[in-house]
Amino acid sequence: MTGFGARLVEATSRRGQLCLGIDPHPELLRAWDLPTTADGLAAFCDICVEAFSGFAIVKPQVAFFEAYGAAGFAVLEYTIAALRSVGVLVLADAKRGDIGSTMAAYAAAWAGNSPLAADAVTASPYLGFGSLRPLLEVAAAHDRGVFVLASTSNLEGATVQRATFDGRIVAQLIVDQAAFVNREMNRSFHRSEPGCLGYVGVVVGATVFGAPDVSALGGPVLVPGVGAQGGHPEALGGLGGAAPGQLLPAVSRAVLRAGPGVSELRAAGEQMRDAVAYLAAV
């Protein structure tokens, strides 16, 4: 399997920059006339898999699956496999973060050979970026990606992420540490091709004030908060000094509200994909 960065570049060049979310919130299940049970969850995901099969990358929100216990995790495993079987990259939005052997166990689950392992996973660095080392090592060994939370769109996040340490805000420190990992990986494999993305990305909310500088990251930037959370697709160009093709806008509710019809859901996704298509060149 080729590295995650290369797979992402190939997928987005053919299928666009948009990352679609699968967020099976109970309110959405009810709006789709589905029961708020594991069976309803499975039906919701089946519709999403069919509608999103032509897109580059899809992001299931793990918490909404966890809420149904073992049955929910079974649906998540099936959904990850179904999406990947039709050529869609899967980003598991699990936001895992811990230390030592516990982090190593999370790494095995989400970036190793577990049925839950996707193409990439989100992670929290707020026990120290170094605490992510087990996850980063396992992801690299299995050609998977890691998106590290840097500057999130929730207001509470700023109390930590905009604090200053070593002359930089914490969000910038996280980006810089992710950039270091990508540089080391490229050096190890003698990669220097223009447009080549590393396997460590960061998460920067679409609505944050003063986004960190991602120009030296060398990896993708996931940009949640577009649509229902107030981020405007047309306002993302050059966010944080990003290069063309580096930003990956993430949209969930703004598209999912078009369901449950597969054609309507697909059309809503395509409309949003068209709205962010300019990011491939800006």
Swiss-Prot record:
Matches recorded under Pfam families: OMPdecase (PF00215)
Note whether Lyase occurs among the keywords.
yes
Q: In which pathway does it act?
A: Pyrimidine metabolism; UMP biosynthesis via de novo pathway; UMP from orotate: step 2/2
Q: Which residues form the active site?
A: 95
Give the PROSITE patterns listed for this entry: OMPDECASE (PS00156)
Q: What is this enzyme's catalytic activity, as reactions?
A: orotidine 5'-phosphate + H(+) = UMP + CO2
Q: What is its EC number?
A: 4.1.1.23
The reply on keyword Lyase is yes
Q: Name one GO molecular function term.
A: orotidine-5'-phosphate decarboxylase activity
Name the keywords, alphabetized. Answer: Decarboxylase, Lyase, Pyrimidine biosynthesis
A GO BP annotation: 'de novo' pyrimidine nucleobase biosynthetic process
Q: Which family does it belong to?
A: Belongs to the OMP decarboxylase family. Type 2 subfamily.
* Name of the protein this chain belongs to: Orotidine 5'-phosphate decarboxylase
Q: Which organism is it from?
A: Mycobacterium leprae (strain TN)
Lineage of the source organism?
Answer: Bacteria, Bacillati, Actinomycetota, Actinomycetes, Mycobacteriales
The encoding gene is: pyrF
